Amino acid sequence: MTKRYWNINLEEMMGAGVHFGHGTRKWNPQIAPFISAKRKGIHITNLTRTARFLSEACDLVFDAARRGKKFLIVGTNNKAAYSVARASRKARCHYVNKKWLAGMLTNWSTTETRLNKFRDLRMEQKKGGLNHLPKRDATMFKRQLARLQTYLGGIQYMTGLPDIVIIVDQHKEYTALRECITLGIPTICLIDTNCDPNLSDISIPANDDAISSIRFILNKLVFAICEGRFSYLRSP
């Protein structure tokens, strides 16, 4: 894996609040090597370690994007949802930002069936087919379409399992992480001080509660993905 320079600035990370962890009572002892201090009852993340692992993650996604690999970004907590959708659209990645449906990856055949249903309903709606149904049936299908859009809208163009999954909140997205581990899909996780760094292929110690922190990390990863995709398109 080629090492590159990603302009990861410690002052910018501090400005984004990347270094703020959880309260000292809510921590995972496995995270100890990533903690530099305690301040006013909270743990402070070692930003030098954050920069190192974020740089490694950027190298990984750059190389993967350069080889045409597919990415899935997962972050369903309220503070992450908008940033996840925005970053994913910019980098043309699949994403889940509302709710992780159990078995979304491990039971891919069921997910594929739901996606096909979603596409069929969208096509019918575009053609105006739903307008010709009895009012009760049309209302039922529109509700079903709205629900599918909410939960599957970010993966509507996904035709198979992703090559790499980026998880914004390891603690909240534990089910998604376990599915990736079961399937052997490489993961990159933002880990706060209540997380286990040993569960992911690359763990980036960072504040997963602040929008500014989440956005900082995602922006770096998205930039690396976009650079990799550009390199892929230029290759003969």
UniProtKB/Swiss-Prot annotation:
GO annotations of cellular component type: mitochondrial small ribosomal subunit; plastid
Protein name: Small ribosomal subunit protein uS2c
Gene3D superfamilies tied to this protein: Glucose-6-phosphate isomerase like protein, domain 1, Helix hairpin bin
One Gene Ontology MF term: structural constituent of ribosome
Organismal lineage: Eukaryota, Viridiplantae, Streptophyta, Embryophyta, Tracheophyta
Entry keyword set: Plastid, Ribonucleoprotein, Ribosomal protein
Family (UniProt): Belongs to the universal ribosomal protein uS2 family.
NCBIfam families referenced in this protein's UniProt entry, alphabetically: rpsB_bact
Coiled coil feature spans: none
Compartment(s) where it occurs, according to its Swiss-Prot or TrEMBL record: Plastid
Record organism: Cuscuta exaltata (Tall dodder)
InterPro entries the UniProt entry points to: Ribosomal_uS2, Ribosomal_uS2_bac/mit/plastid, Ribosomal_uS2_CS, Ribosomal_uS2_flav_dom_sf
Any one Gene Ontology BP term: translation
